[in-house]
Curated annotation (Swiss-Prot):
Pfam families: Globin
Keyword Heme carried by entry: yes
Subunit-structure text: Heterotetramer of two alpha chains and two beta chains.
SUPFAM superfamilies hit by this protein: Globin-like
Taxonomic lineage from the root: Eukaryota, Metazoa, Chordata, Craniata, Vertebrata
Coiled coil location: none
Function description: Involved in oxygen transport from the lung to the various peripheral tissues.
Protein name in the entry: Hemoglobin subunit beta-2
UniProtKB keywords: Heme, Iron, Metal-binding, Oxygen transport, Transport
Globin domain location: 2-146
Gene name in the database record: hbb2
Matching InterPro entries: Globin, Globin-like_sf, Globin/Proto, Hemoglobin_b, Hemoglobin_oxygen_transport
This protein's record includes keyword ATP-binding: no
Source domain of life: Eukaryota
């Protein structure tokens, strides 16, 4: 099931407050620190051997910003997220061989990060809307595996 009109409104109304660099760095850092096996996809990033190294790594920050910027673009295509991510899904599947479960894991890390940055504004209703969006994105990115 796609996102409801109300969920879309909540997301578009709050996304403008996002600092892609800060959110991306923290969310990707959380993923790499919490799920260390995901580091294998980022071997070119240098030292990822500790939380401190991860959270101070400029390559992590840059890639995190790129991913969060992509989510921002996907928000403009909420009626066709699968179409928007079709090529990226194929790339992650056929070239990078990323475990599709990692997309869901990243969505969880991103949701936690948004909660950290939004504070009390990250209501249960807004949280649920973002979770629905991140599930749709994870599903779209996993499409290249089917």
């Amino acid at each position: 099931m796609g996102l409801t009109a109300h969920e879309k409104q909540l997301i578009t109304g709050s996304w403008g407050k996002i600092n892609a660099k800060a959110i991306g760095k923290e969310a990707l850092g959380r993923l790499l620190n919490t799920f260390p096996w995901t580091q294998r996809y980022f071997s070119s990033f240098g030292n990822l051997g500790s939380a401190e190294a991860i959270f101070h790594n400029e390559a992590v920050a840059a890639h995190g910003e790129k991913v969060v910027t992509s989510v921002g673009e996907a928000i403009k295509h909420m009626d066709d997220i699968k179409g928007y991510y079709a090529e990226l899904s194929k790339y992650h599947s056929e070239t990078l061989h990323v475990d599709p479960n990692n997309f869901k894991r990243f969505g969880g890390c991103l949701s936690i990060t948004l909660g950290h940055h939004f504070g009390e504004e990250y209501t249960p209703e807004l949280h649920a809307a973002y979770e629905h969006l991140f599930d749709a994105i994870a599903d779209a990115l996993g499409k290249g595996y089917h």
